[in-house]
Amino acid sequence: MSASLFWKCSCPRRITLCPHWRPCQRLRVSLRHAPHLKRCAATLRVAAGSHDVPLAWPGLAHFLEHLLFLGTERFPVEQGLMAYVRAQGGQLNARTCERATEFFFELPASAFAGGLERLCEMLAQPRMSLEDQHREREVLHAEFIAWSRDATAQRQFALFDGLHAAHPLRAFHAGNRYSLNLPNNAFQQALQQFHREYYQAGQMVLSLAGPQPLEELRALAERYGSCLPSGQHLEQTAPPALMTTGNQTYQQLSGQRLDLLFALERLPAGATAAVDFLCTWLQSAKPGGLLAELQQRQLAHSLKATLLYEFAGQALLHLEFDLTSVAASAPVQVRELLTEWLGFFSAQADWAPLREEYVLLQQRQIEVASALELSRRDSRQAADGLDESGLAALKQVLKQLQPQAVEHFSHDWRLPPANPFLRSTIEAPRAGLIRGQTSAHRGLRTFAQDRSRGRKESSALSFSQALPADPSGSALTLRWQLASPAPMGLHARLLRSLATLRDDARQAGVELIFTSCGKDWLLKLHGLPSPMPAVLLQALKALGRPAESFWQEQASVNAEAPLLTIRQLLKAFSEQPQPDSPAQPDPEALQALWASARWDGLGLALPAAIQEALSRTLQQMPGTADATLCRPVPAGTGQQWQNLPGSAGEHALLLFYPVPSASLADEAAWRLLGQLCQTPFYQRLRVELQLGYGVFSAVRQRNGRTGLLFGVQSPGATVTEILQHIAQFLEHLPEQLQALDEPSWNDQQQALAQQLQPATLPLDQAMELLWQAKLAGHSSDYLPQLQGCIEALTPAIVIQAARQLREAAGGCSALANRPCPGTPWQVAE
């Protein structure tokens, strides 16, 4: 029996609910029409997760999520959703949570129907052969080993130690070789029953978001959603109490990290929005708030408030503090101030100003969200504000957090002021005085001086016309090339000083990123263009001349938990860290660094008025404008090996093979080669050889050079063995490509060419492509030229590129957590 559907349709400024709503019998469908989107996304959320499986089979839900990607009779794995999305340049993932499992992907509109068809097919008709199960169980076991060795994951799991032992949050749910007893008939029956009971329409929500009209989205949902099995909605079993000791809070202290956890029970509808509302203001660093007072008293550097868990009226609130010292009195003082602030916050009358601000924050997040983010948001039925039910839930949350009223306050608490970037933009100031002038000399400043500086800045900052101006999304990248190494830890301190500004900018729809890449410092802004000049102005002030308090602050010594090894390697590959100067950072050292630095930049899709405002703002830019910074990096040769220190753990390796030349024809061939590599590389090393779950290949660009990046993290294979497996794969790659039929070639070639069309190219991808093209010295029509080169490719050209790859014709760079294995590899200088 096929599924029937009920609808929730939304488009800008209009939400309508269709009348036929039978949640106990029908697939729930949410549709969002957003004309500014360049891509489409689908999220299918199943109301069943790790806590819903039989106690005898921990990990079964996560295991099933993996199995569903292994193909169906109609779409075998090489034609399934994962391979299809990769070939179309999209993205996909899945996530098994405590009480839900999500499957989601994003694709160009032209390929969206094929993705939705494969998604619904794989959930409704999985193959789940025993052979597939054995292979995938080993992948899960590798994941489990990595999880058990990952400090961040273990620290997160340990947060639940204070809960009632019978609560499922305390249990093991990851799944491994021993908990997934495949030969046992009882396990196989449980697996089939879990899929049959929960993977049916009554237990699902399908959310679609894209630029198509609602009628088109609805037709897609009807066509492909109807293939899902029909069924009744099942009530999930309510868990036991989070805590049974009477005290609903506990703390954990490790070094300078303080974790406070609060168990909340019997919460009404609207609790998720209520806790999010509370967390928004609780962790605000604005003057008069809790974090500002903690920083003022030098008790804590940072505060992060998170809802760790929410289901059936239960919630677990987590407050993470980065303390400034290990003094025994610090946690006590932090809790006392928290109690005061909660008392102050609870005493407010319905929080009208903050509720208005919160609505604006939610609206702004919707404005700048991608199709994938919108579909995931809609699948969770996230609130757009704090309505009356949310207000009632907030009062209940605060009552449980702060049972007794606070009568006397030791501090003059204040509600956070409005975000300055949300309601209006700040006019960038005109040029100030020349060094040495006073206000009395202002009339003596010549327009020629202003124009001269402006011309230099304008020539150093170029505005690409590759994408049209877009009031819904623009990008700006600024680069400083440092003449000498920065003083020790200076970049990290500057980055921390931008934290409050980054939060305000993000709330206003602008992502602000300050990072390093080799000898360069990069400042990137991405999102709504209207707040960008004001955000940039504040960033340049903070970076160019930090406040006196910046130099007086005690540096945070609470080290971040290490990333997974493969992620450490990827971070190092991107940032190319350089040794700092041993000099201590001080105001004089910073000004000397800026005085010798040169800068340039690139803007994309910026409206003319914003370009003008940014040009004025850049008069505050430290360093010297220089339009000649981009010099193409010469093609390399040889095989260089770099060992990343301090990244011990599972064996992990990245191999980067640059294109042998700077010609766009060669780049086009290698880009198509990279697309053709993805699925067979993953299939060979992850599925067949079962090296581990951290297996990928992709086209990457670094320092203006395009190449193919291969990555593997394995709990069993050594780095030398991983090298051998990759070499064997590359050895047979030309033969594999020769076996492809003509339709497969044409489909892949057409898909790659379409990904570069301005109408469908996402802003962040376009910006990265154009920035790397600038570094490589390509002309302004790089994108159409590259697209033309891709369309002109023949199989013979790509197969020749595969032979070049096999021979490392453009050289090869290895980044690993093990020493150089010797010839033909050389230790990188």
From Swiss-Prot:
Its EC number is 3.4.24.-. The gene is pqqF. Its cofactor is Zn(2+). The keyword Metal-binding applies. This is Coenzyme PQQ synthesis protein F. Binds 1 zinc ion per subunit. The keyword Metal-binding applies. Required for coenzyme pyrroloquinoline quinone (PQQ) biosynthesis. It is thought that this protein is a protease that cleaves peptides bond in a small peptide (gene pqqA), providing the glutamate and tyrosine residues which are necessary for the synthesis of PQQ. It holds the Pfam family PqqF-like_C_4. Zn(2+) binds at H62, H66, E143. Keywords: Hydrolase, Metal-binding, Metalloprotease, PQQ biosynthesis, Protease, Zinc. The lineage of its organism: Bacteria, Pseudomonadati, Pseudomonadota, Gammaproteobacteria, Pseudomonadales. Signal peptide: none annotated. Pathway: Cofactor biosynthesis; pyrroloquinoline quinone biosynthesis. GO terms for molecular function: metalloendopeptidase activity; zinc ion binding.
